[in-house]
Structures are given as structure tokens and as C-alpha cells.
């Protein structure tokens, strides 16, 4: 491979979505407004470099409000959203809080609440323990929403007390995998109520489509992102399914396998 000309294809669109950019800006403006430190509950977005940069600017990241020693300081909720209980707890602590939840995630929250009020039992299609899933499930009373993660769970799902059902989804899922799960639910429960609009974020969809378009042309595919980022992990899966089995998630240049570090680009193209 030493003498082979190397062509680099850049996926387009790429980079942060509007919700991530908005959340980062909220933290930076809060630091300017309130001074330091500013607390952030959970990583504001799942990106190591962003988190480290904000730490250097004066943000302190915690997982729970109880960890905040000085509760006179403001706290920011991450882009993934939080259970309804968290803002209530912040009020009980007399804390100033700023909600950086992505507007598209907030839309799913409102949708779930409205369906619950209309008498529907909710199914949430998503990944267990992901902050967004925890936040969405935390909008509703316990027992009124169930999580389905894969096709097998969809095939085995049972309706309790013959309730009418509806579904919402995590915003950062694989478009194709989610479509298959939804189809199983629709086949099994013809009267299941669908969301008015698809819940998967348009930026997630666009980036997955972009990866599909170029992965089949590639011998090697790098997704640059963090391992706890649902979007980044899904893009690797999409690249592999689209024809590039040699697809790797890295968060920095240092993670490029040694066997590839001698390669030099002959041409770089936006695709």
C-alpha cells in the first residue's frame, strides 16, 4: 500500500448539529453571564474535546445535583434532556438552572406527555441508560412507558390491560434499524399510533445518508467522535453495513492504527 495513491473522501454534511452548537453556546454564554464556576449536569454533549475545552473555561461537570457543593452557582442541563424531576429538584435547592435540551428532544418530551394525557401507553424505541432515553422516560409516570431496544424485544412485546399504544423514538438512532423495529410493531399492532413527525433528528438522518453514499467507495472509513456518542457509534455501524467492513471510530489522530500512519493523501474530495 506504500506506493498506492491515497484519496480521502469527506462525508458531507458532517460535524456538529444545530442542537449541539446551541448547547455549547449556552454554556459559554452562561460562563460570561454568571462567571465561574458554572456547573453542567452530565456532559453537555458527548464529545471529549468540547467537554475538556469547557472545563478549561470554567465549567464543572457533575452527574447529579447532589454533587454540587456550592448551590448558589448556576447549573446547566445537557442537550440530551433530563427527567422532569431534575428541574423540580433544582427549584427545591433554590438553584438557578439553564436548560440546554435540544429542541428536537424537547419535542419528543412534549409528544410523549400529550399521548400519555390522551390515554395512550407509550413505547420508547431507544438504548437503555442513554441520557436521552432516561430523560424521555422521566417525563411520564412510572409504568406508563416501556423501552424497546431491538427487533427481538419488539417481537415479544405484550400490551398490558389491552391499552391503546403509541410510540416515540430516541433522536439519535440508526434510521434503518429503527424502521425495522417500527414495522414489526405496526405488523403486530395495526392500531398503534404513530408520531405526527419522525422523531429521529434530521441531522442524524442526513449524516447517516452521507455515510451510506461514500462508505461503499472506501477501503477504510474513519468516524471521528467519542465512544459514548450514540451518533458516532451509529455512523460506524452504518458504514459497515453500507459496504466498508473496515470502519473504525477514533477520537483523535493518535488512535489511527499504526499500520495506516505512513499513508499520505494524494487528493481530498468533499462528497
Give the ranges of each region predicted by the language model.
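Conserved small/polar residues in nucleotide/adenosyl-binding loops
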Residues: 261-270
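Active-site loop-to-helix "anion-binding N-cap" substructures in soluble metabolic enzymes
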Residues: 3, 7-141, 146-158, 175, ...
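Active-site donor-nucleotide binding/catalytic segment of nucleotide-sugar enzymes
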Residues: 163-175
Amino acid at each position: 500500500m506504500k506506493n498506492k495513491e491515497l484519496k480521502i473522501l469527506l462525508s458531507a454534511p458532517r460535524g456538529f448539529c444545530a442542537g449541539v452548537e446551541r448547547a455549547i453556546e449556552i454554556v459559554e454564554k452562561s460562563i460570561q453571564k454568571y462567571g465561574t464556576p458554572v456547573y453542567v449536569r452530565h456532559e453537555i454533549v458527548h464529545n471529549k474535546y468540547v467537554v475538556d475545552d469547557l472545563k478549561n473555561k470554567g465549567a464543572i461537570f457533575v452527574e447529579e445535583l447532589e454533587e454540587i457543593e456550592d448551590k448558589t452557582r448556576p447549573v446547566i442541563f445537557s442537550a440530551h434532556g433530563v427527567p422532569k424531576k431534575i428541574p423540580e429538584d433544582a427549584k427545591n435547592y433554590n438553584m438557578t438552572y439553564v436548560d440546554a435540551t435540544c429542541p428536537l428532544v424537547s419535542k419528543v418530551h412534549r409528544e410523549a406527555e400529550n399521548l400519555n394525557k390522551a390515554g395512550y401507553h407509550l413505547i420508547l424505541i431507544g438504548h437503555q441508560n442513554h441520557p436521552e432515553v432516561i430523560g424521555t422516560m422521566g417525563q411520564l409516570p412510572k409504568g406508563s412507558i416501556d423501552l424497546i431496544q431491538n427487533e427481538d424485544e419488539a417481537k415479544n412485546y405484550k400490551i398490558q390491560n389491552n391499552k391503546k399504544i403509541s410510540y416515540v423514538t430516541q433522536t439519535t438512532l440508526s434510521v434503518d434499524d429503527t424502521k425495522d423495529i417500527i414495522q414489526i410493531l405496526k405488523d403486530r399492532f395495526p392500531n398503534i399510533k404513530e408520531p405526527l413527525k419522525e422523531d429521529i433528528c434530521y441531522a442524524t438522518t442526513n449524516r447517516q445518508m452521507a455515510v451510506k453514499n461514500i462508505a461503499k467507495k472506501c477501503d477504510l472509513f474513519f468516524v471521528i467522535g467519542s465512544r459514548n456518542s450514540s451518533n458516532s457509534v451509529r455512523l460506524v455501524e452504518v458504514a459497515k453495513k453500507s459496504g466498508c467492513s473496515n470502519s473504525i471510530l477514533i477520537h483523535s489522530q493518535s488512535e489511527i492504527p499504526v499500520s495506516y500512519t505512513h499513508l499520505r493523501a494524494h487528493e481530498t474530495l468533499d462528497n
